[in-house]
């Protein structure tokens, strides 16, 4: 069963050039779904379209869009407590003039009615998931942390809300191998043990082959291959997909990807 089902998704720029070309996409419930492809293929555009985060100079159309079996009219009502978004510009999520403990508490209490002590308990638990301790984080400002630490705080801020769906755009790209693998293990755990759903965009094909159950391959704005993990491990693949998996490249991203 799919949690998100969008049909004939098309994204165009101001010159009417199609950047995403009429794709059908399902994000399967309680699975790790992946979208792979080279830089410039349009992967991040798809994530932003699903979240209604596209830049103003791009237009998005589709024939139908359902979330959890219901037609989507205003997706913003689901943000935070139902849909979490992990994206690369994590530093933008925190300001520099308020301590992180106060910011994280405000985020939690925005979505859940709770006292400060309960919020701090949930924050402490989420920070421990990403190998951080509250005593090292909550009394600091964002600029006092390294990029890797701040990214893990950001991931914790999404996970603490326990959203039904997490859309993650290169969630561990800025982390070292040890912490990156730990975060991926955590994301796999919340899907397998807690029934959450993950849609991940990544260039790390080793992670895709290790963690994901369903995979989409995007090339020049079109989905050229899709299937479960067994299809990608054991069946004949599109030549483009074979090339991606063979080299397992970590490619730089351009503005729209």
Swiss-Prot record:
MF GO annotations: ABC-type nickel transporter activity; ATP binding; ATP hydrolysis activity
Catalytic activity: Ni(2+)(out) + ATP + H2O = Ni(2+)(in) + ADP + phosphate + H(+)
SMART domains in UniProt: AAA
Predominant location: membrane
Positions annotated to bind ATP: 37-44
Membrane topology per record: Peripheral membrane protein
Matching Pfam families: ABC_tran
Entry keywords, A to Z: ATP-binding, Cell membrane, Ion transport, Membrane, Nickel, Nickel transport, Nucleotide-binding, Translocase, Transport
Entry-linked InterPro entries: AAA+_ATPase, ABC_Ni/Peptide_Import, ABC_transporter-like_ATP-bd, P-loop_NTPase
Top-level EC class as recorded in UniProt: translocase
Subcellular location: Cell membrane
Domain of life per record: Bacteria
GO cellular component, as recorded: plasma membrane
Enzyme Commission no: 7.2.2.11
Residue ranges of domain ABC transporter in the record: 4-245
Function: Part of the ABC transporter complex NikABCDE (Opp2) involved in nickel import. Probably responsible for energy coupling to the transport system.
Similarity remark: Belongs to the ABC transporter superfamily.
Subunit-structure text: The complex is composed of two ATP-binding proteins (NikD and NikE), two transmembrane proteins (NikB and NikC) and a solute-binding protein (NikA).
UniProt name for this protein: Nickel import system ATP-binding protein NikD
Organism: Staphylococcus aureus (strain MRSA252)
Lineage: Bacteria, Bacillati, Bacillota, Bacilli, Bacillales
């Amino acid at each position: 069963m799919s949690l998100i089902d969008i049909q004939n998704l098309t994204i165009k720029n101001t010159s009417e050039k199609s950047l995403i070309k009429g794709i059908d996409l399902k994000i399967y419930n309680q699975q790790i779904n992946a979208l792979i492809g080279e830089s410039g293929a349009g992967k991040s555009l798809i994530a932003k379209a699903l979240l209604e985060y596209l830049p103003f100079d791009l237009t998005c159309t589709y024939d139908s869009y359902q979330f959890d079996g219901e037609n989507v009219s205003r997706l913003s009502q689901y943000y935070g407590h139902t849909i979490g978004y992990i994206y690369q510009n994590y530093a933008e999520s925190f300001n520099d003039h308020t301590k992180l403990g106060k910011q994280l508490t405000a985020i939690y209490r925005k979505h859940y009615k709770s006292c400060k002590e309960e919020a701090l308990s949930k924050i402490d638990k989420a920070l421990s998931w990403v190998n951080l301790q509250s005593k090292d984080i909550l009394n600091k400002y964002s600029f006092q942390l390294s990029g890797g630490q701040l990214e893990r705080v950001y991931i914790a801020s999404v996970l603490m809300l326990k959203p039904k769906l997490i859309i993650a755009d290169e969630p561990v790209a800025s982390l070292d191998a040890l912490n990156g693998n730990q975060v991926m293990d955590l994301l796999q755990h919340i899907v397998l043990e807690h029934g959450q759903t993950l849609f991940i965009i990544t260039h790390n094909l080793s992670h895709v082959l290790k963690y994901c159950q369903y995979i989409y391959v995007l090339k020049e704005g079109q989905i050229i291959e899709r299937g479960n993990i067994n299809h990608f491990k054991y069946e004949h693949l599109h030549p483009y997909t074979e090339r991606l998996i063979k080299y397992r490249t970590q490619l730089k991203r351009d503005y729209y990807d």
